[in-house]
Curated annotation (Swiss-Prot):
GO CC terms in record: cytoplasm
Source organism of the structure: Ralstonia nicotianae (strain ATCC BAA-1114 / GMI1000)
Name listed for the protein in its UniProt record: Ribonuclease 3
SMART domains named in the record: DSRM, RIBOc
Residues in DRBM domain copies: 152-222
Amino acid sequence: MSLEALQQRLGYRFSKPELLQQALTHRSHNAMHNERLEFLGDSILNCAVADMLYGMFGKLDEGDLSRVRANLVKQQALYEIAQMLLLPDELRLGEGELKSGGFRRPSILADALEAIFGAVFLDGGFDAARTLIRKLYIPILEQVDPRTLGKDAKTLLQEYLQGHKIALPQYAVVATHGAAHNQQFEVECTIPKLEIRVSGSGASRRAAEQSAAKLALEEAHRLVPQLVKRSRAERTGKTRKQATPPDPQLSLRLKE
């Protein structure tokens, strides 16, 4: 198989192309598969991303750095990068896995990408692997907010309301639908001060709460600026009223 186009997309040329070929080989294809390279690449990825975050975000504490890193190295993030690199076209799969659509499976694509990182490390050393990882991740980091990346909707809503000194939302299950083994929960989220009342649904109470929180957060982002603007206008009006000096002519007329 020709790997020239993939090497161009990676921006790295292998001195041992067989390493790249192995990185793209699933265990269903033959014995020289990519699982050991994946194991190695996983560690390289975590180290390189940690180094990158440490240098880029000097104000984030250890907990936030760990949260951001976990979000960047999880399967979904790797899958999206693998899609961008057109890895589905390059995978070597066994016949059964190929027929079942393995080239579209997120886990297989994520594993192959980690294996590529491991292959680059063996071929060119840690600096080469780190350079590749930075090339792939810097554009992603430029588009995300590290303060919120990886936080769920309930957490984001709570932090947003606390930041504006608004009482926390209330959640209540208002309905359940379906058979016991396949229930759908409907949860209502209310924020009295903002007059927000929205509902979300999900296969579990937690999922339904997250769905409702996401909708409530969207509403809060729309309403809170209006509330702040109105509050400032009211304070400005009171200040002006208090600062207005008495009219001496009016005082004379009142005395008469």
